[in-house]
């Protein structure tokens, strides 16, 4: 018996889906000239020839050096210095030739191992000492010193050996540079390592997104602003004649799934001018300075194709308020933002470029980015109302088949808080269910199951009869009774024992309209209704038998009561806003930096006021359960038998035992009631 669904101020936030993309942006193919191909071929042939000559010449040079050594009498046989002294003492040395300043000696000596034949050996000397020279003179041995002689081949060999690696390195870098700049792959091709600073924006000279303003519904005000921008691009003389200038930027602000990107696709398809699109996260890379370089490159290309439109999706990835990052003023993201600010409205200006950006976190954007001159217009794209939801359902339902019992107006009334993406997902889920069940059209049953699945989760296995099922039934009926009998509460739409997600049972409440202003009576009534499940458990089964099933209910009503005290000023403390604006921000850093402006005494008063509201609401819930015990038993009996009761069925049974408040009465024919 998990949290009960109670549709408080609005529906619980839903996982949103992105509208299907309408096409892939085409990338222009760069074709190099034949002359450039010939030049590159010549360079490659020259490099191959040079490397080939080097490969052939190295063995030749090595052979030449070996021959030169042999001419100088350098033997491959070696003799140790101690053995040389031994041969010298035994008068076996005949001749000594000294090389390299007396450190190398080529010795002609008589070798007993070779039958007293003369052998030429090489001896490494520790140095030409006077004692050794004196000894050579005493033995009357012929010795001579030779200077180092190098021919031109040896000089060339040493020169090539010293310059080979630098030349190969420089040549490789040169080839990489030519490939990156000469069209051999472009920014995403094989030459890309040197193209990090290039913009990754998708460019379309004649955008073909497949989306027009006719495909956008439910956001009429935002659509009107964009239609003016398109009109300005197509017929600028109508506006310049009265001194108007084209807006430099339009910022789309709204929750996820409300159609911000869809509006950008529509303006791209309607404007008829070059269109650049990029995500804010594509500016920042792992290398320092890449983000600012990409911003410069993007606006350089935009100026070359002006007038044009630049669309930056999720601009909060790069436009976050400065000074809140870990890196401080040297943060790479801040450098990118500074360059973006300069390009949008700096000394040079960007005449003819309209920047359109979208975000769902406008509260964390830098104030310099939001000022007029950069983003002249801020268009709010909010969750649609009943009329907007109806228009959106008509757009997404145009290619689907519905049974005669399905009304798009009824679906719109049953889905408060749904965004455009949620409604598109709803109809798609209903179509999938209809196909799975072998139907040729979508019925109200598929619509009902799809709404339940989106809001509460997958349908689980129904519980077998027993104490747990009875406890869940009393818990859910307690919610329904307390909500229906408390003035100002939303009407019951459905009570069910079919598990969904983590909930063992569900009670659905649905507002009769879309309330933009909620009164204190309505908020307090929702707290009473939320505590009805725990009150029913305590009255029916006793205080020791209350369960953890009300954990989600308690979390919701505690948060609502705290909002009444801290945010809305609906308590005995007075009409104060007791929450720092920074603490309400969606940014974690800004919440950490927010100053706690309340004293310990005030914090204690807030806790007392929240507890007073909860206790008062719980006493009312207990009283309503005690007073309507007979009605509760009857409703639970029917619910255990049918497992699901519609709002009309529930109110019909309850009205037999007690009178429903006038403001909570719902006509039986209301569109909010579900088919049984």
Curated annotation (Swiss-Prot):
Residues reported in the UniProt entry to bind Zn(2+): 475, 479, 553
Single Gene Ontology BP annotation: proteolysis
Cofactor(s) essential for the protein: Zn(2+)
Transit peptide found in the keyword field: yes
Transmembrane regions: 155-175
Transit peptide (residue range): 1-32
PROSITE patterns, per the entry: AAA
Function: Probable ATP-dependent zinc metallopeptidase.
Record protein name field: ATP-dependent zinc metalloprotease FTSH 2, chloroplastic
Gene label: FTSH2
């Amino acid at each position: 018996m998990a949290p009960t669904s109670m549709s408080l101020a609005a529906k619980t936030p839903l996982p949103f889906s992105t509208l299907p993309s309408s096409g892939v942006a085409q990338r222009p193919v760069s074709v190099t000239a034949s002359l450039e191909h010939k030049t590159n071929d010549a360079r490659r042939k020259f490099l191959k020839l040079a490397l080939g000559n080097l490969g052939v010449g190295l063995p030749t040079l090595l052979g030449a050096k070996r021959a030169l050594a042999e001419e100088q009498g350098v033997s491959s046989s070696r003799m140790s210095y101690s053995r040389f002294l031994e041969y010298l003492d035994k008068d076996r040395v005949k001749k000594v030739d000294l090389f390299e300043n007396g450190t190398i000696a080529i010795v002609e000596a008589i070798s007993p191992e070779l039958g007293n034949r003369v052998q030429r050996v090489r001896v490494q000397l520790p140095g030409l000492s006077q004692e050794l020279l004196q000894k050579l003179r005493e033995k009357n041995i012929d010795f001579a010193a030779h200077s180092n002689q190098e021919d031109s081949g040896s000089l060339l060999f040493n020169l090539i050996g010293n310059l080979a690696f630098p030349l190969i390195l420089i040549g490789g870098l040169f080839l990489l540079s030519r490939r990156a700049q000469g069209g051999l792959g472009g920014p995403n091709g094989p030459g890309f390592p040197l193209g990090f600073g290039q913009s990754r924006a998708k460019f379309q000279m004649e955008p073909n997104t497949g989306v027009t303003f006719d495909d956008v519904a439910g956001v009429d005000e935002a659509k009107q602003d964009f239609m003016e921008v398109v009109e300005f691009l197509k017929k600028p003389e109508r506006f310049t004649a009265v001194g108007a200038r084209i807006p430099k930027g339009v910022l789309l602000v709204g929750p996820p799934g409300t159609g911000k990107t869809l509006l950008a696709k529509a303006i791209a398809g309607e404007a008829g001018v070059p269109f650049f699109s990029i995500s804010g996260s594509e500016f920042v890379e792992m290398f320092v300075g890449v983000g600012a370089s990409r911003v410069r490159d993007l606006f350089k290309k935009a100026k070359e194709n002006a007038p044009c439109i630049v669309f930056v999706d999720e601009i909060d990835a790069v436009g976050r308020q400065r000074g809140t990052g870990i890196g401080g003023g040297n943060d790479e993201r801040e450098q990118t933002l500074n360059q973006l600010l300069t390009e949008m409205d700096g000394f040079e200006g960007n005449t003819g470029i309209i920047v359109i950006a979208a975000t769902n976190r406008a509260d964390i954007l830098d104030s310099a980015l939001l000022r007029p001159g950069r983003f002249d217009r801020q268009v709010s794209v909010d969750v649609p109302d009943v009329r907007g939801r109806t228009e959106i359902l008509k757009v997404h339902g145009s290619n689907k088949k519905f049974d005669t019992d399905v009304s798009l107006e009824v679906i719109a009334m049953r889905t408060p808080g749904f965004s455009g993406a949620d409604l598109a997902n709803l109809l798609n889920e209903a179509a999938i269910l209809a196909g799975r069940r072998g139907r040729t059209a979508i019925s109200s049953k598929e619509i009902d199951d799809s709404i339940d699945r989106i809001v509460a989760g997958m349908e689980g296995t129904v519980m077998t009869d027993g104490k747990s099922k009875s406890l869940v039934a009393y818990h859910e009926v307690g919610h329904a009774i307390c909500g229906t009998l408390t003035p100002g509460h939303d009407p019951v739409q459905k009570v069910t024992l079919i598990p969904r997600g983590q909930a063992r049972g569900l009670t659905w409440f649905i507002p009769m309209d879309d309330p933009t202003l909620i009164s204190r009576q309505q908020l307090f009534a929702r707290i009473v209704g939320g505590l009805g499940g725990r009150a029913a458990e305590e009255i029916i089964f006793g205080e020791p038998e209350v369960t953890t099933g009300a954990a989600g209910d308690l979390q919701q009503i505690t948060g609502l009561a705290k909002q009444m005290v801290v945010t809305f000023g609906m308590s005995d403390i007075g009409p104060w806003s007791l929450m720092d604006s920074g603490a309400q921000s969606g940014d974690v850093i800004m919440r950490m930096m927010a100053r706690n402006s309340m004293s310990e005494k005030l914090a204690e008063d807030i806790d007392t006021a929240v507890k007073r509201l909860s206790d008062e609401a719980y006493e009312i819930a207990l009283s309503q359960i005690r007073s309507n015990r007979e009605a509760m038993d009857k409703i639970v009996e029917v619910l255990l038998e049918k497992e699901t009761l519609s709002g009309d069925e529930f109110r019909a049974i309850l009205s037999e035992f007690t009178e429903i408040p006038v403001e909570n009465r719902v006509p039986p024919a209301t569109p909010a009631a579900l088919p049984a």
